[in-house]
Regions:
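Small-residue-enriched flexible segments
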Residues: 1-127, 132-157, 162-185
């Protein structure tokens, strides 16, 4: 069993992509994407604004048939930039028209909850952990955060792995290259 902890939580409301070209998202819910983002920032509490300042992400819904979307229902990608001239955002993946997209923030508490929740279903005696070099002490207040949780999940059995700048693992039944994740086999 492979688990992928993306460690992000959705903020604001989900939007349907109404205008896009490859990874340039111009319209969300029939309005300019940057306008939607500006509203999100304006309405956010101070803690969420601080998390946004450290790095805002988008989640692309992997199963459009769900009645509501929660953490884990998204393929999380980074926001690469903005085109203020057309009110668009550029993201780290394609977002075809009709795709549901929601903004996300990453924080240590969510990342811990996400990893621990995913590891609860693991029944293994050993594990391989591939964790982003942007996690660890950059995200958590302790060293070896992910390795400790995985070790606990396998009952103290052997754990090996490495830091990565791009981890591979499944989300929505398909393998993807990720950033800022802990992918565990």
């Amino acid at each position: 069993l492979t688990v992928v902890s993306q460690g992000c939580r959705p903020v604001g409301e989900p939007y349907i992509v109404t205008d896009s070209e490859t990874n340039l998202v111009r319209g969300l819910g029939m309005r300019p994407a940057l306008e939607r983002l500006g509203e999100l920032v304006d309405d956010a509490d101070e803690e969420t604004k601080a998390l946004m300042a450290r790095g805002l992400h988008v989640g692309i819904v992997v199963d459009e048939s769900a009645d509501e979307f929660r953490r884990g229902d998204f393929l999380v990608r980074g926001i690469l930039g903005a085109d203020h001239g057309v009110g668009a955002i550029r993201i780290g993946d394609r977002a075809p028209i009709g795709t549901t997209l929601q903004f996300h923030v990453r924080d240590a508490e969510t990342a811990t909850e996400d990893l621990e929740s995913l590891l609860r279903v693991v029944d293994a005696d050993a594990a391989l952990v591939f964790t982003c070099n942007g996690r660890g002490h950059r995200l958590f207040s302790e060293a070896d955060h992910d390795a400790r949780r995985v070790s606990d999940a396998v009952g103290g059995g052997p754990v090996a792995g490495m830091f990565c700048a791009g981890e591979i693992g499944p989300v929505g039944g398909e393998n993807h290259v990720h950033g800022f994740t802990a992918s565990t086999l």
